[in-house]
UniProtKB/Swiss-Prot annotation:
Residues 86-123, 200-279, 347-371, 429-450 are annotated as: Disordered. The lineage of its organism: Eukaryota, Fungi, Dikarya, Ascomycota, Saccharomycotina. Its main location: nucleus. ATP binds at residues 969-976. It comes from Saccharomyces cerevisiae (strain ATCC 204508 / S288c). ATP-dependent helicase involved mating type switching and in silencing interference through its interaction with the silencing regulator SIR4. Cooperates with UBC4 and UBC5 to mediate ubiquitination of SUMO conjugates. Residues 103-118, 211-226, 353-366 have a biased composition (Basic and acidic residues). InterPro entries: Helicase_ATP-bd (IPR014001), Helicase_C-like (IPR001650), P-loop_NTPase (IPR027417), SNF2-like_sf (IPR038718), SNF2/RAD54-like_C (IPR049730), SNF2_N (IPR000330), SNF2_RAD54_helicase_TF (IPR050628), Znf_RING (IPR001841). Residues 1447-1606 form the Helicase C-terminal domain. The keyword Transcription applies. Transmembrane segments: none annotated. Residues 956-1157 form the Helicase ATP-binding domain. This is ATP-dependent helicase ULS1. Keywords: Activator, ATP-binding, Helicase, Hydrolase, Metal-binding, Nucleotide-binding, Nucleus, Phosphoprotein, Transcription, Transcription regulation, Ubl conjugation pathway, Zinc, Zinc-finger. The modification Phosphoserine is found at residue 121.
């Protein structure tokens, strides 16, 4: 039976102050009426004399004694008088014994023979106990005399109580007398801090020291200290144990008295009185001075008492004794005592007269022991009334007795359960089998733990030596585990005892406080009552007052004693805690060494066996070669035999053998799941799965291994808790976790633990939900509720203080301070206080459990704050664990761990199925495109062949499980007409869900409406509606939208609707929510009076959603992108000729909208694709990684995309019979003064740019862009640079001439801008695009909307205010100005609060003060006076044409010379370039022209395009790149001039295709003007890189190669299987 750690609840419950009772928590203790028992014994005249000698004494616990007719004894143990777990009897000094004998001689009478027997031997008193019974009459004088002496003795003890040592004053359980001495369950011999653990269980020499030493020390005590001796009751006798020999005459007896005498030879119980007396005399003579175990009592020799007490507790052991072993039938007085048929447990104490052999045989039993009584809680056994088996004498030196006496130790540490009979080790060890558990138990009890673990044997040793080494290591490991278990049990018992004593002392201290308080109240009450009457105080009253005051002083002294003892116990617990840490450290080192040696030996043994087998095969092969040479073997037979041998050799490869060995040994040393550290388990599983991963390179694996080790290092450092965790260590752990998560290593338990240990993750997906945010949110909500409650102010302050303690605790952790024991105790008290106040924050409380904080009053009382840090570690509740210490190598467990941690390329089952379904679509794409659909009857035009093929593909996809895809045909192939054909070919049959939603840029909406009106027959009754704009362009309800067949809306308008629909409760929490919220969940947070957009109602489900120019949602963070992805629709389509323009992340936004699983989840997309294309120092991927990612992109696009270029052919013919397009690059170099100007500007700007880039201050990035802009302008014309600089100099800092009303007002407006608005300024600076005209911004001529942070051109401010003030969202302010909505985000800005970017830069980036601003104001006023006189106006007449102007004029002149009708489109990013070009076209060449720029309103733009088509004289169109690169059809022109290169090559291609599309009948010529040896060279290089990346993924030829891959190859590419 396993030994249970002892918890001693030491409670004094006696009339005498020197008696202790220790209750073990492993038993059920019945209430004991000790006083009643004492009274019975005294009334019966039972007095127990003790010898003057201080040697050990024999005693018997007797409740009631009688002699039956058959002269046998029977012990009747009443339930109400059950003996306690351990009775601490006081050891009497020589002085005490003499006084006691004098008293007893007076009491017992003058019988000569009997008195001599009592005086000469302690056996006499024992014999008298057997003779006394109820029938013996007692004289009244004797009773009176006895009672008087008892009272006198009690008074004497009470008088001496103040002189007794404070460490050994006992406490009556009812609070009558003094306190108890806490149990010292481990003595000084247990030195746990030794580096080399003594685990041999050999007794210390101090334990068997000569008792004469104690006698001498006792004789030297101060006799004056003890003035009274209490009457000895049955509890005063020393408890001793023995086993009983049985005789045949006792088998039928009914009554027994169990003698508990622990000595070498057990005496036989006498069958009659004389035999009893002689036996007692003989045994007393044998053990005199040796057998008694002294118990702590009222003595002043503290050092001696502590030594004896520690020795006693060291040998306490719970020893169950089966009742069936007794030869007598034991009965209870009360029938209910043994109703549960339990096992009787008897108290056992060690005897010091045992010889060395006997003690050794029982040493392991006595090492960790406690006194055990009869328990109703133990295992059920035979009933008491049914047991009549004879008692058999056990031989203490037999092997059976040894095995039965050694208690089983249940290990509470995380010791691995190693099956040393595992097949792998058995196979490696050969015929040398491992010893059985029974044999090992016998051998291990006497063996000594070896100091060091055997090292690895040489690789060339023989097989026999390897097997021998392995067997030795197995045995050593078994002994190591056993010894560690033993040592652990010792430590845990010590800690448990100290912990229990601390608990009791705390209870007693609280009781002492109450007693002092009650006594003080009583004393004050007496004083008050006597003072109230005004009469003289009588002597009786004075006695009462004095007695009350004395009682109060005594109670205060007792309280102080208890406090001192509690401090002493806590100090002991701290020492044990340090010993525990040292033990755990040494345990881990020893285990690791042992396991490593065991693994190496097993591997080497197998390797040796493999080498021997290979040598045998090679020898056979040589023999066959010799036989073939000699001609004794035919060639066919030789070939067959050598083939078999070669197959054996192939099967015996050492490399494979090593891998197999390691994998097979690992399950052997694997710990039970329930007892392993789940954090370490997660890390180990991640490493294991990474090792098995086939799609990662070795370099990547090594990097990830290093990051996993960083996390383990941080965890260990935090849990050690000895010092502050520095910022660098936390940063390393944070970066490692981020990189691992990005690389697909998903370990929820690890990341949650790191967050709880103070790591703050910027990516909310790593820990979702955010436990840290929930922690502080709970506290904030609790504060709010308490402040609004009706509780008293005192209660509110108390609760607030508790909440502050819990909040500060977590803040300390986030700062890098690990929790200390004192902090845990303080937070535990706060939690208990909150619970008592009724605050239910269960999640918060459970989160605190991770830091081992008690959350209930019971836990707070029971758990000492000094208990070891890593004791009782429990796994999280959501971890499904099945304890299995035997079979830990099952495949099911390995698979569950893979799914549990979601390591990269080991997807969850759902992701795997989704990827397989996606790969099925890859194989179907070829067959789908083979078909051809007919043109719908409701169309007014016939579809071209490639369009019919496209329509067939679109219809097939809608009939599949994908329900949508990407139509990425080249510009001009008719994506719009194919989409219209799809809407007509697959119209909805349900009137409730028939609406097609078409989202497009504003400039394209009119084109769509026109196409629908002209391409669809009227009989189709296909209704359309444009949502937005002025007039009746908006509806409020979904039912109004659902009436139309097609609803057209711009991206900007849809984003505004999403913004207005957003619940007010979630304002400011967008970043904490999913990027694509669920509409129904979102609407639950709205109130009835909020705005409901018809696009986002619960019933809003469109039949089909089409995104034209889908690249507009490429930024996943924009509101337009989120709005498009949130809308519900049955079918979802993206139309875009350039779905990828800058990075692979742009593709994710489209996948997210299409909801293609599993890559619609950002984590999955980044894991397999996105992360390999990021340029960051954190992500170190080689070319092979990127190639694999590109293959995945092609597979993905092949499954969801249809892309055809104009060069593609069908049946040998191109898709479109278009004339050719010729792209010419007209390269030139700067010369003369222009070259000097550019060179000087470049040198100056390079120096400034270097300085700015090295400066990390805000605003430096925009300054670098300005310098780069100047270089690009210089390539076009040097005058552009001058105009830009003059504009910058003349830029107004603020409108208005009043410093207070204008400048200072705007200054404060900027300083009060929200953080979100300031962040938006930085975002707008990155794009350098005006939100109104979409033109490129010029830093010297742009302003900031203070309400939202968007940037706008100075020239666009007036039209923006004019149009926006007419919108219904605009509001008129008190001053008459309008608060107008931003076109992009709908946030309001007062028209007078639009500030220049120059002022914003001065205030935010340069940190201007009011004084600086005033100085700038004065300088500005002077500049304005000068500028009024000298306003810079370019002198166009004196301007010389630049190289770019000359190139442009040459192209125009050549075109005009070759044709009288051909028209030209000229694209540029700089509208100021058009001003210079206009001068030369108008004045020098006299060529008419038109201009199309973003500052024009929609009507003006439309008029320009119509005039360009109709007027044959207007052959030149100047068009800005931003305003006209998409949405326009300009096939009336066939010449395109690109003046300056744009960052994005696809923007240029879109501009070119404005005229190269369907209906173009002329050859198209593209003229790209280029300046060599300038900044345009570097822009061209950037274009080339972007184009290579996109083309590598979008190349139709490479995408088609995917179709040649088999199913297995595709699965391998995505990590689903091996090749």
């Amino acid at each position: 039976m396993a030994a249970v750690p002892t918890i001693d609840l030491t409670l004094a419950d006696s009339d005498n102050e020197d008696i202790f009772h220790s209750f073990s928590s492993s038993t059920s203790v019945d209430k004991i009426d000790i006083r009643k028992e004492n009274g019975k014994l005294r009334m019966a005249g039972l007095e127990v004399a003790q010898s003057n000698d201080d040697a050990a004494r024999q005693a018997f616990h007797v409740f009631k004694t009688n002699i039956s007719n058959n002269e046998t004894f029977d012990t009747i143990l009443s339930k109400s008088k059950t003996i306690t777990d351990s009775t601490f009897n006081n050891e009497k000094s020589s002085n005490e014994v003499k006084q006691q004998q004098v008293l007893k001689e007076e009491t017992m009478g003058s019988s000569n023979d009997e008195k001599k027997t009592q005086e000469s031997s302690p056996s006499a008193e024992m014999i008298k106990l057997f003779y006394e019974n109820d029938d013996v009459p007692l004289s009244d004088s004797f009773k009176q005399k006895e009672e008087g002496k008892r009272i006198n003795q009690d008074e004497q003890v009470k008088e001496n109580i103040c002189g007794i040592s404070s460490s050994y004053v006992s406490k009556d359980y009812d609070g009558v007398e003094d306190d108890f001495e806490p149990n010292t369950c481990q003595d000084s011999n247990l030195d746990f801090q030794e580096e080399k653990l003594n685990l041999n269980n050999k007794p210390s020499q101090q334990q068997f020291s000569d008792p004469e030493t104690k006698d001498n020390s006792l004789k030297s005590e101060n006799k004056d200290q003890i003035k009274g001796v209490t009457t000895t009751s049955y509890r005063d006798l020393p408890i001793e144990s023995s086993a009983f020999q049985d005789s045949e005459t006792q088998n039928n007896s009914k009554n027994t008295i169990p003698n508990i005498v622990n000595e070498k030879r057990t005496p036989a119980l006498p069958s009659n009185l004389s035999s009893v007396e002689s036996s007692l005399k003989n045994e007393t003579a044998k053990v005199e001075g040796k057998t008694t175990v002294r118990l702590p009592g009222l003595q002043n020799n503290v050092a001696l008492l502590e030594q004896e007490q520690s020795e006693l507790f060291k040998h306490f052991s719970e020893q169950p004794v089966d009742i069936s072993d007794f030869g007598r039938k034991i009965k209870r007085k009360h029938s209910g005592d043994f109703a549960d048929n339990k096992i009787l447990k008897r108290p056992i104490l060690p005897s010091k007269n045992m010889d060395h052999t006997t003690h050794n045989s029982h040493d392991s039993e006595q090492k960790n022991s406690s006194i055990i009584i009869l328990s109703d809680e133990d295992e059920s056994g035979a009933g008491i009334n049914d047991i009549e088996s004879p008692l058999k004498v056990s031989e203490p030196n037999t092997a059976d007795a040894l095995r039965s006496s050694v208690p089983e130790v249940i290990s509470l540490l995380d010791l691995p359960n190693i099956d040393l009979n595992n097949s792998v080790i058995k196979e490696a060890s050969g015929s040398n089998s491992i010893p059985t558990s029974e044999t090992d138990a016998q051998s291990s009890s006497s063996s000594v733990l070896q100091g060091t673990i055997m090292t690895e044997q040489a690789t060339q040793s023989s097989q026999h030596e390897c097997n021998s080494s392995l067997d030795t290591l197995k045995k050593n490991h078994q002994k190591l585990l056993k010894d560690l278990n033993s040592r652990e049990s010792e430590l845990r018992n010590a800690l448990s005892c100290c912990k229990t004593n601390s608990e009791i002392l705390r209870r007693k201290l609280s009781r002492r406080e109450k007693e002092v308080s009650d006594a003080e109240k009583h004393w004050q009450l007496l004083l008050t009552s006597m003072a109230r009457g005004g009469r003289t105080i009588s002597s009786t009253q004075q006695i009462l007052v004095d007695e009350a005051e004395n009682q109060l002083n005594k109670l205060k002294e007792k309280r102080q004693l208890t406090k001192s003892k509690l401090d002493s116990i806590n100090l002991k617990m701290y020492n044990y805690n340090e010993q525990w840490k040292s033990f755990v450290h040494s345990k881990n080192i020893n285990l690791q060494k042992s396991l490593a040696a065991l693994e190496r030996s097993a591997r080497d043994s197998k390797a040796s066996a493999t080498v021997n087998k290979r040598n045998e095969c090679l020898a056979e092969k040589e023999k066959l070669d010799q036989m073939l040479k000699e001609g004794t073997l035919s060639f066919s037979t030789y070939k067959q035999l050598t083939g078999e041998i070669q197959q054996k050799l192939n099967d015996l490869k050492l490399g494979d053998q090593r891998t197999t060995d390691i994998n097979s040994v690992l399950p052997i040393v694997r710990q039970p799941l329930a007892k392993r550290d789940l954090f370490i388990k997660s890390i180990d599983t991640a490493k294991d799965l990474l090792a098995k991963n086939t799609s990662r390179t070795e370099m990547t694996k090594r990097i990830l291994y290093r990051h996993l080790d960083n996390l383990v290092s941080y965890k260990n450092f935090f849990e050690d808790g000895r010092s502050l965790i520095d910022i660098n260590r936390r940063h390393v752990a944070h970066e490692s976790a981020q990189i691992l998560f990005t690389n697909g290593v998903k370990m929820p338990i690890v990341f949650e633990t790191l967050q709880d240990y103070g790591i703050k993750f910027s990516n909310p997906a790593i820990v979702n939900p955010d436990r840290r945010a929930q922690y502080f949110k709970s506290i904030e909500v609790a504060r709010d509720l308490i402040s609004k409650s009706t509780r008293s102010e005192d209660a509110k302050r108390k609760i607030t203080r508790f909440l502050n303690i819990i909040e500060e605790f977590r803040k300390d952790i986030d700062t890098g301070f690990p929790p200390t024991p004192l902090k845990r105790e303080g937070v535990g008290k706060a939690v208990v206080g909150l619970r008592q106040q009724g605050l239910k924050m269960d999640r918060l409380y459970e989160n605190l459990r991770r830091y081992k904080i008690p959350i209930t009053s019971e836990e707070l009382l029971q758990q000492s704050y000094l208990f070891p840090v890593n004791a009782d570690q429990r796994p999280p509740s959501n971890w499904n664990i099945v304890e299995n210490t035997e079979d830990t190598s099952s495949t099911a467990n390995d698979l569950s761990m893979q799914d549990e941690f979601h390591i990269s390329n080991m997807h969850a089952a759902e992701d795997q199925e989704q990827i397989r379904a996606l790969l099925e679509n890859v194989k179907q794409s070829e067959s789908i495109i083979d078909g051809e659909a007919l043109t719908p009857e409701d169309m007014t035009v016939n579809l071209l062949k490639h369009q019919r093929l496209g329509l067939h593909w679109l219809l097939q996809v809608e009939n599949s499980a994908k329900k949508g895809g990407l139509l990425a045909d080249d510009m001009g192939l008719g994506k719009t007409i194919q989409a219209i054909a799809l809407m007509l070919a697959n119209r909805s049959e349900e009137s409730k869900c028939k609406t097609n939603l078409i989202v497009a840029p504003v400039s394209v909406l009119r084109v769509w409406k026109g196409e629908l009106e002209t391409k669809v027959k009227k009989r189709a009754k296909f209704t359309t509606f444009i949502f937005g704009g002025s007039g009746n362009g908006k509806v409020k309800h979904w039912r109004d939208l659902a009436r139309y067949d097609a609803v057209l809306v711009s991206y900007q308008t849809l984003a505004n609707e999403f913004k207005k629909h957003w619940p007010k409760k979630l304002d400011g929490e967008q970043n904490q929510l999913p990027a694509v919220p669920h509409i129904q969940a979102l609407n639950r947070l709205k109130t009835s009076n909020e705005y409901y957009s018809p696009f986002f109602c619960n019933d809003s489900t469109f039949y089909r959603i089409l995104l034209d120019e889908g690249q507009n949602i490429k930024n996943k963070n924009t509101r337009a992108s989120k709005a498009c992805c949130t809308i519900n629709g049955m079918y979802r389509w993206v139309l875009s000729g350039t779905p990828i323009q800058n990075s692979m992340d742009e593709l994710y936004s489209l996948i997210r909208f299409l909801r293609i699983p599993p890559y619609h989840k950002e984590q999955r997309f980044k894991l397999d694709i996105g992360r390999f294309f990021q340029r960051n120092k954190q992500y170190q991927y080689d070319n092979e990684d990127r190639k694999n990612a590109l293959r995945k992109v092609r597979v993905l696009l092949n499954a969801i995309m249809l892309r055809r270029s104009k060069a593609d052919k069908i049946d040998g013919k191109p898709l479109l019979e278009l004339p050719p397009k010729i792209v010419e690059v007209d390269e030139s170099r700067l010369k003369g003064e222009e070259l000097k100007f550019y060179t000087a500007l470049e040198s100056k700007n390079q120096a400034l740019a270097k300085k700015l880039l090295n400066n990390s201050t805000r605003g430096s990035y925009s300054s670098v862009l300005t310098l780069l802009l100047r270089l690009r302008q210089a390539c076009c014309h040097s005058e552009l640079v001058v105009m830009g600089e003059k504009k910058a100099e003349g830029t107004k800092v603020a409108n208005g001439k009043s410093f207070e009303d204008d400048w200072l007002r705007l200054y404060y407006k900027i300083t009060h801008m929200s953080g979100e608005a300031q962040a938006q300024v930085i975002t707008s600076m990155n794009s350098m695009t005006c939100f109104w005209c979409m033109e490129q911004l010029e830093p010297e001529a742009m302003s900031v909307l203070t309400g939202c942070g968007h940037l706008i051109c100075d020239t666009c401010i007036e039209p923006f205010i004019e149009e926006s003030s007419m919108l219904p969202q605009a509001k008129k302010t008190k001053g008459g100005a309008f608060a107008i909505p931003c076109k992009d985000c709908q946030r309001l800005t007062n028209e007078k609060d639009i500030v220049s970017h120059k002022l914003y830069d001065q205030v935010i980036n340069q940190g201007f003060t009011e004084e600086d601003l005033h100085a700038e104001y004065l300088s500005e006023m002077e500049k304005q006076k000068i500028q009024q006189k000298n306003v810079y106006v370019p002198n166009f007449e004196s301007l010389e044409p630049s190289t770019k102007i000359e190139q442009c004029i040459q192209v125009i002149q050549r075109v005009f010379d070759e044709s009288a009708t051909e028209k030209i489109i000229i694209f540029s990013q700089f509208t100021t370039f058009f001003e210079i070009l206009e001068h030369f076209l108008k004045n020098k060449l006299n060529f008419p022209y038109l201009k199309y720029i973003g500052s024009m309103n929609a009507q003006r733009r439309s008029d320009v395009i119509n005039e360009f088509y109709r007027d044959p004289e207007k052959r030149i169109l100047l068009i800005s790149m931003k305003a006209g690169n998409s949405g326009l059809t300009l096939t009336c022109a066939n010449h395109v001039v690109i003046v300056d290169p744009f960052w994005n090559p696809y923007v240029e291609e879109q501009a070119q295709d404005r005229c190269y599309r369907i209906s173009q009948t002329k050859k198209v010529q593209v003229h790209k003007l280029f300046i060599k040896d300038s900044v345009e060279d570097r822009i061209s290089e950037l274009q080339k890189r972007k184009k290579e990346m996109v083309d590598s993924a979008m190349d139709p030829g490479k995408i088609k190669e995917v179709n040649s891959l088999g199913r297995r190859e595709l699965g391998f590419l995505f990590g689903l299987n091996a090749l």
